[in-house]
Amino acid sequence: MIGLLTLAVFVATFAVIYRWAEGSHLAVLAGAAALVVIGTISGSYTPVMALRSVYFETLALIFGMAAISALLARSGVYAYLAAGTAELSQGQGRWILVMMALVTYGISLASNSLVTVAVVVPVTLTVCFRTGIDPVPVIIAEIIAANLGGASTMIGDFPNMILASAGKLHFNDFIAGMMPVCLILLAVMLVFFERRLGDWKGSEIPVDPVWARGEALRHSAIDRRLLSYGLIIFGVTVAGLILAGPLKVRPGWIAFVAGVTALGLGRFKDDEFFSACGGTDILFYGGLFVMVGALTSVGILDWAVNWLEGITAAHDRVRAILLMWMAAAVTIFVGGGTSAAVFAPVAATLRLDGDGQAAWWALALGIMAGSVAALPGATAGSLAMTQYSGFVKRHPELASAAAAGLQFTHREYVRWGMPLMGIFLVLGTVYIAVLVG
């Protein structure tokens, strides 16, 4: 009975989040509080157990990398890179897509997808509308590239931070286990867009020439002092993460110290501090860990592990691949961070032959594949859609041009994302099969 009630609260919480994404951290905190109250009354989940279920190292990673990303973004370097890359494309639709996808991937290696998309999408919209190019395929490619970049490193996005803490993984493990396959998938994605768009050179939508002439691409001014601080802190942090294994120091605490330093040097205003340190994300994932702990305490995740082992018998390869596909399916609806928190305890129980970390890479690839399928699963999908609609509203003279191109809707995104999810899962299956051996 308690198990069913716990599961019902968990499902209800994410049903609320699905309808009210902006208040997701409040919904999760309310759900976590409800589960602690239920567990305390029933004796199945005490406040001490809830506290022990939190991956504090993950929260330290989120804090540290958010602060470093905020410092670099405040310096103007991200916007400068995006604008410079867009100008190098010389107004050719194909090159705008390729180059903006590559710079998005590069930024996402160290910054979460929300920061990356917040920087590159406004630049993309200005360049595309100025040159008469439909921006929707470019933005979709950027969202997917951001997910691939985030999946490539331990510090790129929230799911990998969770997996790093749960699996006691290090920075170098992700570079060796995830980056090579993600680079292959990035190349596959670019080929997919190339083939699907065909002879796509630009001048696809009618743009008011008066607006196009007046809307110059503005280079962001770089604060060299902040940039110097940011690059030094980031460089020292990466060096520390690389050496964390030999030094027997957990990566989260290296990132935490770096984050405190970044906040101290970043000259953030009082109303910017909470955002700069990833406050909303820390609240969300802290509450989420408590909720997942409640599922574990009543045996729901143990049941899932036993079910997975039962249907796959002793076939390690099949078990890892099934975990990957299941994670992808769940991520479409609840997002990568939630899937990572839910499936991490499952992956931790899998003992596979061959590469001992294969279960973690299977889970990471499944989460990444699911995150590209639909906007609810994509970390920055909703933000990109909001930026697109806001840009068109601020420039009503672009309404006819936007209407002439592809419409940036959930359905349009799925037309691109769902086939790519299938391709990524097939290639990921081959990769995991080789690792498990």
Curated annotation (Swiss-Prot):
Q: Does the keyword Transport apply?
A: yes
Q: What induces the gene encoding this protein?
A: Part of the probable 18 gene mamAB operon.
- Keywords of the record: Biomineralization, Ion transport, Magnetosome, Membrane, Transmembrane, Transmembrane helix, Transport
GO CC, alphabetical: magnetosome membrane
Query: Which InterPro entries does this one have?
Result: Cit_transptr-like_dom, Diverse_Ion_Transporter
Any idea what a deletion of this gene does?
Cells have no magnetic response but still make empty magnetosome membranes; magnetosome proteins MamA and MamE localize normally. Deletion of genes mamH to mamV (amb0961 to amb0978) gives cells with no magnetosomes and no magnetic response.
* Pfam families referenced in this protein's UniProt entry, alphabetically: CitMHS (PF03600)
Q: Which GO terms describe its biological process?
A: monoatomic ion transport; transmembrane transport
Name the CDD domains on file: P_permease
- Where in the cell does this protein reside? Magnetosome membrane
Instruction: Note the topology in the membrane.
Output: Multi-pass membrane protein
Bilayer-crossing regions: 26-46, 53-73, 95-115, 136-156, 174-194, 226-246, 252-268, 281-301, 320-340, 358-378, 416-436
Recorded superkingdom: Bacteria
PANTHER family (alphabetical): P PROTEIN
Hey, which family's this protein in? Belongs to the arsenite-antimonite (ArsB) efflux (TC 2.A.45) family.
Checking NCBIfam families in the record gives:
MamN
Miscellaneous information on this protein: This bacteria makes up to 20 cubo-octahedral magnetosomes of about 45 nm in diameter which contain membrane-bound crystals of magnetite (Fe(3)O(4)). Expression of just the minimal mamAB gene cluster (amb0961 to amb0978), including this gene, is sufficient to form a minimal magnetosome chain with small magnetite particles.
Give a short account of what the protein does: Plays a role in biomineralization; might regulate pH in the magnetosome.
Q: What is this protein called?
A: Magnetosome protein MamN
Species of origin: Paramagnetospirillum magneticum (strain ATCC 700264 / AMB-1) (Magnetospirillum magneticum)
Q: Which gene encodes it?
A: mamN
